Amino acid sequence: MSRGQELVLLTGATGHVGYAVLVKTLQAGYNVRATLRDMSRADAILSSGPVQEALSAQDLDLSFVRVPNFTAPDAFGLVLSNVTHVVHVASALRRGTSTDLKEAIIDVAVQGTRNILRAAHNCPSVRRVVITSSVSAIVDQHPVVSQSPAGRCVTPLDRHADYDAEYYKGDSLKAYTAAKTAALNATDAFLATADGGPTTLPLHFDVINIMPSFVFGPKGLAATPSDVTNGSNIFGIGLVMRHKPWDGIRLEAVCCHVDDVAQVHVNALNDHELLPLKVGAHRDFILGVKFKPEEIGEIVRRRFPREWWESESATFGARGTYDWYHTDYDVGSAERLLGRPFKCLEEQIYDSGSQVMEMLKGMTTRSYN
């Protein structure tokens, strides 16, 4: 089957990572069917420059299908027709006023993942399911200390038991970690038991888990600087933009460029040459480069004009910082799949900072017109 005949079902296409995956998937020549909770978001995707360029360069199909609730028993049962690959990027985030983090975040992540796997099990055309996991799913998050005993790297095969409710009580960020951990464990359990619900069909696909660290870099659908820093970028370019205290936040200073994350997802779709199909198996890939927060300010001062950072009131003039620690990860397999070393911190900060600058320049220009 030629790539132009292959169809990728993509979740999370409006997010930081998901949109980047969408663009690179189209650029690689795949047709895409994107799930949306709100179909009005399709216009923003279709009108974006990178998507328009990708569609005009090749004869491809980009379609959208509404999946309002990932936890519904047959949420994906009707959307996988003729799909050859599934890329599940969407992450459960706290929505509305719900204070039940288990229901709002963890159950959505776990049940959504199970539903996708079960639907794929019932769709013979699916050959591969690629899932966006996280390094937070495989390291112990309590207590927060260095995860790297002398001489040992955390590997993609490491796992962590599900967290109990006391760990994430009242903390949506910890609930996100618990959700990623539980979803990864649910994926492993599915493959181990071929838990496909009522079907007795043998498995006919494999699973690829992509495990990024903090994802820095431009956001394709961002409209304002606050959109850019809403998410993991707050710990990247957001460090020199946030004027509020960090209140003792301590985090793992390991990051990756959104372009690398997206490209690894797309390369993982190649089940012929780059990553041959292994039915019933899972293969996992970690992305991350170590950094020190003080390096972010140094990059900004080196790469951007003085007026953007010289005073504390400047766009990139914030002086605060957070506490940090390092974890050693085995990233060799991901770099081999990518085909090159990961982009460094400087590229991550420069690219996201440049997006902020262009936005602000555009706002200034419009205000004078």
From Swiss-Prot:
UniProt: NADP(+) binding residues: 176
This protein's UniProt keywords: Oxidoreductase
Effect of a null allele: Leads to a strong reduction by at least 90% of the production of fumonisins B1, B2, B3 and B4, and accumulates 3-keto homologs of fumonisins B3 and B4.
Gene Ontology MF: a single term: oxidoreductase activity, acting on the CH-OH group of donors, NAD or NADP as acceptor
Top-level taxon: Eukaryota
Pfam families: Epimerase
InterPro entries linked to this entry: Epimerase_deHydtase, NAD(P)-bd_dom_sf, NAD(P)_dehydrat-like
CDD domains in the cross-refs: AR_SDR_e
Pathway it works in: Mycotoxin biosynthesis
EC identifiers of the protein: 1.1.1.-
Record GO biological process: fumonisin biosynthetic process
Enzyme class: oxidoreductase
Function: NAD-dependent epimerase/dehydratase; part of the gene cluster that mediates the biosynthesis of fumonisins B1 (FB1), B2 (FB2), B3 (FB3), and B4 (FB4), which are carcinogenic mycotoxins. Within the pathway, FUM13 stereospecifically reduces the intermediate 3-keto intermediate 2-amino-3-oxo-12,16-dimethylicosane to the 3-hydroxyl product 2-amino-3-hydroxy-12,16-dimethylicosane. The biosynthesis starts with the FUM1-catalyzed carbon chain assembly from one molecule of acetyl-CoA, eight molecules of malonyl-CoA, and two molecules of methionine (in S-adenosyl form).
Family statement drawn from the similarity comment of this UniProt entry: Belongs to the NAD(P)-dependent epimerase/dehydratase family. Dihydroflavonol-4-reductase subfamily.
Protein name according to UniProt: NAD-dependent epimerase/dehydratase FUM13
Organism, scientific name: Gibberella moniliformis (strain M3125 / FGSC 7600)
Native organism taxonomy: Eukaryota, Fungi, Dikarya, Ascomycota, Pezizomycotina
